[in-house]
C-alpha cells in the first residue's frame, strides 16, 4: 500500500502514558493506517529522527466562540500543537440568540473574556438563532478541529429576555424551555453545557452575568437534558462568592454544583481549580469536596493549569497599574509612541507618582473590584510581578521580582514598574500571576495537576486577548514540567503527553482521537522536544475593526498534522485547512 504520509524514525508517545517506542507512523485517508518499521512507500515522508511523535493536543477550555466565525486558523492554539479545541466555556457565547440581543451578548463577552466589542461587532456574522444554526454557521474549513458547548448566559437571555438580568429566578416554564433547548443542542452535536458563577465575571457595563445567580432548581433542570444521552459534558467556573466574604457560601455553592453534576445522568462534570491569595485554603477544600462527590458516584473532574494564571501588564495591554492615575488618564487616548514620549518627561513621572489611583472598577466597567484591592497593595503585588524576558520564565523567585529590583535601585516598586513599562519603547511587559502563585512557587500547582481527578484546562484560548496568552499551556507543560524544571518535581514526558491527549479525549468522549493507534484520526504532532521553546508574548493588531491581541509563538514544532494534512511545518502555518467542527451525538456527522 502507498500511504499518503509516513512520519519516520520518531520516538512515539502514543498518548496512553506508557513508555515510548521508536518507529514510523503511516497515514492514509486522514487516518492512522500503520505503526511500526519498514512500512513501505508514501507520497510524503517526514523525518522524525531525534523528535517525539505525539497525538495532536486537545484544549478543553477555550473561548473561540466569536473568533471561529472570522479566523480560520484559531491562533494562538494552533501554534502550540493543539489540533482540537473545545469552546463554549464558563457560560458565555453567542447562541441561541434573538436579533435584539446581539449587542447584549457582545457586551457580555467583551466584559467577561476581554475580547474587544468592536472586533466582535464587526467579525460576527449573526446568521443564526438556535444553537444548531450556530454550529451550521461556523462549520467551514479551519486549520484545526473544534467543538462547541451550549452556554448558559445566552440560553437564559433567549428564554427569559430582560428577566434574565433582573435577579429574577427562572420559572418552571423557563427551566423546561432551557432544558428543551439544551437537549436540542446536544442532539445537534454540541459536546456539552457550561455555566459561570464567578464574582470577577462582569459584562462590559459592569453588570453581573445573566446566570451567575441561577438557582439550584434551574441548574438541575438544565442538567436533566443529558439523561438518556451517551455523550456530553458539563463545565462550571465558581469562586464561591469569595468577593462577598460570606463564610457559608463555599459549602452552599458546592452543594449546588454537586446537585447540578449529579442530575446529568452520570455525564462528566469539570470545575475550575486554582489557588487564590485571598482564600489560600480554598483549593484544598475543593479537592476534599470533589473527592467526596466522587465517592457518591458523581463523575467530577477539576480543570487545572500548568502555571500561574495571571495577567500581562503593559502600556499596550488592557490593564496596567497606572490606568487609574489622573495624569495617565489624560494621555490614555494617545497612540503608544506619544504616551511613551509624555511618560519619559521627569516632571510627568514625578506628578503621576505623587497621585493616588482612582477606582478602576465599578458600574460601567468590566474590571472587577479585585483590581482596586490589588492596586492599593502595590508593594505586595510587586513581590509577585516579574519580567518574563525573551525566554519566558513563569516560575521565578521573589529575588527576581519587581519588588527586589526596586529595592536594589533604591526606588519605590511603583517607580520601578513605571520605568520597566517604558522599556523597548513602551512594548515591555510584566507578568503578574493572580492565581496559583501564593507561595511564590509551583508546589500547589504540582499537587493540583497530579491529583487523580485533575484534568488539564483553563487556557482560555481566544479570550482575555489584551491581558493573557495562556493558549501556550501545552508548550509550557512540555518544556517546563517535562524537561526544564529545577525548583521541584517534574512530570514525566509520557504523562505530560497523556494529559494533553487521551485524558481529555476520553473525558469529552472523542473516541476517534487522542491516541496514536491504527484507525484513529491522523491528528499528530512531530516535536523537537530537546529544543522546544516558548517565545515572549507580543501584541498584534489583526482583529476585526483594528483590534489587538496578544500572541505567543513557539519554536520546535516540526509538524502538526490534522486529518492527515500538515497544517504547521517548522512552526509556520502551511495554509491548509482540513479542520472542521466536531459534533457528537445522534446527529453527529
Per-range role (PLM):
Residues 10, 30, 50, 61, ...:
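Divalent metal-coordination and catalytic microenvironments
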Residues 10, 370, 443, 447-454, ...:
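C-terminal cap of metal-dependent C-N hydrolases
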Residues 13-24, 430-439, 445, 492-495, ...:
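Acidic, glycine-enriched loop/beta-strand segments at the rims
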Residues 32, 39, 91-92, 153, ...:
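Short, glycine-/Ser/Thr-/acidic-enriched flexible segments
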Residues 134, 138, 142-143, 149-159, ...:
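Active-site neighborhoods of metal-dependent hydrolases
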Amino acid at each position: 500500500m502507498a500511504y499518503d504520509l509516513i512520519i519516520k524514525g520518531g520516538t512515539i508517545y502514543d498518548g496512553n502514558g506508557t513508555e515510548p517506542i521508536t518507529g514510523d507512523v503511516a497515514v492514509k485517508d486522514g487516518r492512522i493506517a500503520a505503526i511500526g518499521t519498514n512500512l513501505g512507500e508514501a507520497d510524503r515522508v517526514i523525518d522524525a529522527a531525534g523528535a517525539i511523535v505525539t497525538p495532536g493536543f486537545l484544549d478543553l477550555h477555550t473561548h473561540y466562540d466569536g473568533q471561529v466565525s472570522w479566523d480560520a486558523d484559531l491562533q494562538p492554539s494552533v501554534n502550540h500543537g493543539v489540533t482540537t479545541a473545545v469552546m463554549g466555556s464558563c457560560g458565555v457565547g453567542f447562541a441561541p440568540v434573538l436579533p435584539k440581543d446581539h449587542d447584549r451578548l457582545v457586551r457580555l463577552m467583551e466584559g467577561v473574556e476581554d475580547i474587544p466589542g468592536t472586533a466582535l461587532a464587526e467579525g460576527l456574522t449573526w446568521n443564526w438563532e438556535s444553537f444548531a444554526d450556530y454550529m451550521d454557521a461556523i462549520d467551514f474549513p479551519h486549520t484545526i478541529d473544534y467543538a462547541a458547548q451550549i452556554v448558559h448566559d445566552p440560553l437564559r437571555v433567549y428564554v427569559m429576555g430582560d428577566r434574565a438580568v433582573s435577579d429574577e429566578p427562572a420559572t418552571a416554564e423557563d427551566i423546561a424551555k432551557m432544558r428543551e433547548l439544551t437537549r436540542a443542542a446536544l442532539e445537534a452535536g454540541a459536546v456539552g453545557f457550561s455555566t459561570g458563577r464567578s464574582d470577577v465575571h462582569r459584562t462590559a457595563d459592569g453588570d453581573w452575568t445573566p446566570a451567575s445567580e441561577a438557582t439550584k432548581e434551574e441548574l438541575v433542570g438544565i442538567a436533566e437534558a443529558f439523561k438518556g444521552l451517551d455523550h456530553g459534558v458539563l463545565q462550571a467556573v465558581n469562586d464561591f462568592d469569595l468577593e462577598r466574604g460570606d463564610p457559608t457560601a463555599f459549602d452552599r455553592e458546592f452543594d449546588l454544583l454537586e446537585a447540578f453534576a449529579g442530575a446529568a445522568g452520570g455525564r462528566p462534570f469539570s470545575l475550575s481549580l486554582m489557588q487564590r491569595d485571598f482564600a489560600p485554603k480554598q483549593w484544598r477544600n475543593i479537592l476534599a469536596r470533589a473527592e467526596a462527590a466522587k465517592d457518591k458516584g458523581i463523575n467530577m473532574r477539576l480543570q487545572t493549569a500548568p502555571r500561574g494564571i495571571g495577567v500581562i501588564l503593559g502600556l499596550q495591554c488592557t490593564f496596567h497599574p497606572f490606568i487609574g492615575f489622573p495624569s495617565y488618564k489624560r494621555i490614555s487616548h494617545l497612540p503608544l509612541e506619544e504616551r511613551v514620549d509624555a511618560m519619559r518627561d521627569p516632571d510627568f513621572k514625578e506628578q503621576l507618582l505623587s497621585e493616588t489611583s482612582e477606582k478602576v472598577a465599578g458600574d460601567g466597567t468590566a474590571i472587577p473590584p479585585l483590581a482596586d484591592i490589588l492596586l492599593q497593595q502595590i508593594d505586595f503585588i510587586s513581590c509577585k510581578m516579574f519580567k518574563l524576558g525573551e525566554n519566558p520564565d513563569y516560575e521565578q523567585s521573589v529575588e527576581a521580582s519587581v519588588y527586589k529590583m526596586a529595592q536594589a535601585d533604591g526606588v519605590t516598586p511603583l517607580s520601578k514598574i513605571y520605568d520597566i513599562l517604558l522599556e523597548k519603547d513602551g512594548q515591555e511587559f510584566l507578568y503578574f500571576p493572580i492565581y496559583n502563585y501564593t507561595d511564590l512557587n509551583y508546589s500547589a500547582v504540582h499537587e493540583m495537576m497530579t491529583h487523580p481527578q485533575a484534568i488539564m484546562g483553563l487556557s482560555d484560548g481566544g479570550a482575555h486577548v489584551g491581558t493573557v496568552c495562556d493558549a501556550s499551556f501545552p508548550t509550557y507543560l512540555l518544556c517546563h514540567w517535562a524537561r526544564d524544571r529545577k525548583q521541584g518535581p517534574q512530570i514525566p514526558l509520557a504523562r505530560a503527553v497523556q494529559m494533553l491527549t487521551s485524558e481529555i479525549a476520553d473525558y469529552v468522549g472523542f473516541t476517534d482521537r487522542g491516541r496514536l493507534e491504527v484507525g484513529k484520526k491522523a491528528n499528530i504532532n512531530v516535536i523537537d522536544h530537546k529544543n522546544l521553546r516558548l517565545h515572549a508574548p507580543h501584541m498584534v493588531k489583526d482583529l476585526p475593526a483594528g483590534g489587538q491581541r496578544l500572541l505567543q509563538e513557539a519554536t520546535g514544532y516540526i509538524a502538526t498534522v490534522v486529518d492527515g494534512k500538515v497544517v504547521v511545518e517548522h512552526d509556520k502555518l502551511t495554509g491548509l485547512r482540513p479542520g472542521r467542527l466536531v459534533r457528537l451525538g445522534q446527529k453527529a456527522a
